[in-house]
């Protein structure tokens, strides 16, 4: 019953988010029509639909860059240091040597992301507002400035899209900057968790662990449930995977799967993948595996070219299907996809999992001969 209620709440939340986006879009459209309707109507008569569509596509990409650039500028102005900048699936990272490199990374539910290393954490004095607000402020201000300088139909498309993107990020909803600002403004716990997440990401990009996070977390009680505090769950799961405690991974991931259907999409997908991996290894007869493979979120995730998806499928084909050959093919695929891991630490962990599975599979092949 609790799981059904959670699912109902999650569906209502998604519908509420969609309705709010539609209302914001309608409000922006009405205001634009009221102030600029007659002028734009005259211009539209002489404009190609193909050009307008191309303008929309280019404007979308530009506003993702502008949005993440706003986060970058806001962070630099308040003591943050650059870690990575992602637009769609193309990611620019700063290496430990100080150089830069490009690589591919897909993160469900996000068009881009600018991650930075925060300044040293000080209770009540942790800067977060300009870093978080920089994105939607950049979208809105750039849009207004552009249309003021060049008031034509193409810039109108650019400006309208930017204002809409800015407002839907500024108004607190689900998993956006406005919601982050609201959560951090209300709670020091959330501010501490954001600091830990950003600092941990900095070290993960260098292939190193950040054990200080456990010291920070031991000093507080996680008594809030939101997409910031939910991130701390994955620290425990990552540690268990690294230690090869796959039964404990199964137990914890299954508990979260059953109790937390309201998790944001990227988190929910990661829980589904981890549960498929651990259930396949530890409980290949579990009927839950079939349910997992029918979940649209997991189906979509397994299509992305990431090494952890290939290792999960290798575990499934080996233990559930008894198909060693296909399992080894997935492991070979996982090796090729290692550069697409979230960060260097995740890449190294995934390489260890591949070695572990390969050793088990090869031993099974030898015993079968």
Where are these regions (language model features)?
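Topogenic membrane-insertion module of multi-pass membrane proteins
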Residues: 1-56
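Membrane-embedded alpha-helical segments that form the functional core of polytopic membrane enzymes
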Residues: 45-65, 154-167
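Small-residue-rich helix-interface/hinge motifs
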Residues: 54-118
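Polar-ligand-bearing catalytic/cofactor-coordination segments
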Residues: 77, 114-119, 173-260
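Hydrophobic transmembrane alpha-helical segments that form the core helix bundle
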Residues: 111-112, 117-208
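Alpha-helical repeat scaffolds
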Residues: 211-222, 246-260, 283-300, 323-335, ...
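Alpha-helical adaptor scaffolds
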Residues: 238, 242, 261-313, 318-322
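TPR/TPR-like alpha-solenoid helical repeat scaffolds
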Residues: 267-279, 307-312, 343-366
């Amino acid at each position: 019953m609790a799981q059904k209620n959670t699912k109902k709440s999650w569906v209502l939340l998604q519908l509420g988010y969609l309705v709010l986006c539609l209302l914001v879009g309608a409000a922006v459209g009405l205001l634009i029509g009221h102030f600029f309707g007659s002028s734009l109507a005259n211009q539209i008569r002489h404009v190609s639909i193909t050009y307008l569509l191309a303008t929309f596509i280019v404007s979308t990409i530009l506003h993702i860059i502008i949005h993440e650039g706003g986060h970058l500028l806001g962070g630099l102005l308040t003591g943050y240091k650059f870690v990575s900048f992602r637009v769609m699936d193309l990611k620019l990272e700063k290496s430990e040597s100080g150089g830069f490199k490009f690589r591919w990374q897909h993160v469900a539910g996000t068009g881009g992301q600018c991650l930075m290393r925060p300044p040293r954490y000080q209770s009540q004095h942790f800067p977060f507002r300009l870093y978080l607000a920089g994105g939607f402020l950049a979208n809105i201000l750039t849009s207004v400035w552009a249309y003021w300088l060049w008031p034509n139909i193409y810039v109108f498309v650019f400006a309208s899209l930017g204002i809409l993107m800015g407002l839907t990020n500024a108004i607190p909803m689900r998993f956006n900057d406005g919601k982050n600002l609201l959560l951090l403004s209300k709670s020091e716990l959330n501010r501490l968790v954001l600091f830990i997440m950003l600092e941990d990401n900095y070290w993960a990009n260098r292939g190193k662990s950040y054990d200080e996070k456990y010291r920070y977390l031991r000093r507080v009680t996680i008594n809030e449930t939101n997409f910031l505090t939910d991130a701390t769950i994955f620290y425990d799961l990552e540690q268990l995977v690294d230690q090869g405690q796959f039964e404990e991974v199964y137990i914890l991931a299954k508990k979260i799967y059953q109790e937390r259907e309201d998790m944001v999409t990227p988190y929910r997908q990661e829980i589904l993948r981890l549960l498929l991996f651990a259930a396949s290894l530890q409980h290949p007869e579990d009927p839950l595996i079939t349910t997992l493979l029918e979940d649209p979120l997991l189906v979509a995730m397994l299509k992305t070219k990431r090494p952890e998806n290939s290792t999960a499928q290798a575990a499934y084909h080996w233990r559930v299907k008894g198909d060693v050959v296909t399992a080894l093919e997935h492991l070979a695929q996982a090796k090729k996809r290692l550069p697409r891991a979230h960060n260097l630490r995740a890449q190294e962990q995934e390489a260890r999992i591949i070695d572990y599975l390969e050793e088990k599979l090869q031993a099974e092949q030898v015993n079968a001969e």
